[in-house]
Amino acid sequence: LGNEENGRWSLRPSDEITRARRRYRDDTLILETELSCEKGVVRLIDFMPPRGEAPDVVRIVEGVEGTVPVKMSLSIRFDYGSIVPWVRRRKQGLLAIAGPDALFLATPVELVGRNLHTVADFEVSEGDRVPFVLTWYPSNRPPPERTDAEEALEDTASFWREWVTDCAHTGRFREPLVRSLITLKAL
């Protein structure tokens, strides 16, 4: 649907990626992507916590091996990519507003505006975890309480694992059945 000018959020090693592997954590809708490059390996953990008041997209960059330079690029667009929002820096993040919509990106990483995009360059070493939490809310209301990425990760995993306990099937097709059920529930 469109191109990066219509909106995009990229997190990746600055160096050339030599290997990429993706998987969902067992019985969850938490996506893990391992990206390898010459300097090491990073894991991206992507999910949406199941909370009703303000939808979040949470991304955690985890250092798995070595010290890896990472680049982030965020192009926020509303109305199917046709509206570029007004963007302001805030303490540990940024605020983007366009008409009735607002987004807050919370992260400890320093963010810079460049050519109508938000970018960041940082490094992660083995054991480091760098969170990014993007939250939507109506622009005529105050921002919702910030989501703690690590707490949201635990809560999201618990939510999905508890939800799939209702699936009584234990046969050889349990895994694809559960994956299908989770996908349908997410819709």
Tell where the protein language model's regions lie, with residue ranges.
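Acidic, mature catalytic/reactive cores of soluble proteins
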Residues: 1-187
